[in-house]
A protein has these predicted regions:
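Short hydrophobic/aromatic beta-strand or adjacent loop that forms the aromatic wall/cage
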Residues: 109-112, 135-140, 229-233, 255-260
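Active-site glycine-centered loops adjacent to acidic/histidine catalytic or metal-binding residues
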Residues: 53, 80, 188-189, 256
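Acidic carboxylate-rich catalytic motifs and surrounding loops in phosphoryl-/glycosyl-chemistry enzymes
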Residues: 127, 190-191, 214-226, 246-250
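Surface polyanion/phosphate-binding segment centered on an Asp-His-Pro turn
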Residues: 16, 142-150, 238-278
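Active-site neighborhood of phospho(di)ester-bond hydrolases with catalytic His/Asp-centered motifs
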Residues: 76-79, 185-189, 214-220, 235
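Arg/Lys-enriched, amphipathic patches
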Residues: 35, 150-155, 183-199, 262, ...
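Short phosphate/oxyanion-binding micro-motifs
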Residues: 1-181, 194-196, 202-213
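Nucleic-acid-interacting cores, centered on viral/eukaryotic replication and modification enzymes
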Residues: 50, 56, 216, 248, ...
């Protein structure tokens, strides 16, 4: 067992910037269009991570690239890819390499996968021993970008998944990978609605705060005729990421909208004069 980082009280935010003119704050989803949402991400100095519950990656990956091109994210994270392992091996996404995956063997659908841009060097972190179908499906990669090292984790919990098992396993995963010099990013569909305060959200927030991680997506990610929820999220250490923004990116490929995290730099264990902006 490793020691967790000291707990700190951090506000839940949409963006953190060094000054008010560096980067726009997260736009409200009711006031943005797909074109508007892309604007903060066009600066080549940003490192971009994409997550979507894709509800089957089969026959969607080429259309997905057409939505993103030419401003391709550095990392693509998918939950519910719905593919078997051999099928996933046959999915080729131009400009990307398969970095890590989990595929179900006992149940249909589900699964998580991470692709990294061909310009990056990534290492797979083997989390297979932590996976339990429906309760927690998880995979991770480690990336070295200039002088920074990141661990990107993608997680899925089914609506019928056991929450306590999910919570205990996330804790175990974070204990296994945590390092003060490592920038940890968790993205995924955890089926906890972050538009409301509920007991499951409180328990997850309290656990993640032990690792200085907070959810930064405060906009709806799934809209139906009867509900509006934010069951997909991105969790980061807001004290270490410099000039970050997280935005929705509707593309019509799923009933879940994309979240795109973009940031300029990571400062391990410090906050470089940052200012929180809601």
């Amino acid at each position: 067992m490793v020691n967790r980082p000291p707990n700190s009280s951090l506000p839940t935010t949409s963006a953190v910037v060094k000054n008010d003119t560096d980067i726009p704050t997260t736009p409200k989803p009711t006031q943005t269009s797909g074109k508007d949402i892309k604007q903060p991400l066009l600066n080549g100095n940003y490192f971009k991570i994409f997550h979507q519950n894709i509800r089957s990656l089969r026959e969607k990956h080429q259309e997905l690239l057409s939505h993103l091109f030419p401003n391709l994210p550095h990392v693509l994270c998918f939950t519910e890819h719905h593919l078997k392992a051999f099928e996933l091996q046959n999915i080729n996404i131009d400009h990307y390499t398969l970095g890590a995956q989990f595929c179900r063997t006992s149940h249909a659908q589900g699964g998580v996968v991470i692709y990294t841009h061909n310009s990056l060097h990534s290492t797979t972190i083997n989390l297979s021993k932590f996976c339990a179908e429906k309760d927690i499906e998880i995979c991770a990669v480690k990336l070295e970008v200039q002088s920074s090292v990141f661990c990107i984790i993608t997680a899925y919990r089914s609506p019928s998944g056991k929450f306590n098992h999910f919570l205990e396993t996330i804790d175990a995963v974070l204990q296994s990978v945590y390092s003060p010099s490592l920038g940890i990013i968790i993205c995924g569909d955890i089926n906890i609605n972050y538009l409301v305060i509920n007991e499951q959200r409180k328990q997850l927030d309290n656990l993640l705060l032990l690792y200085n991680l907070v959810g930064v997506a405060d906009f709806p990610t799934r809209l139906t005729n009867t509900s509006t929820t934010a069951i997909d999220n991105v969790f980061i250490d807001v004290s270490g990421f410099y000039d970050y923004v997280v935005t929705p990116f509707p593309n019509g490929l799923s009933d879940h909208d994309t979240q795109i995290l973009a940031f300029r730099a990571w400062y391990p264990g410090q906050s470089p004069g940052t200012k929180f902006v809601r």
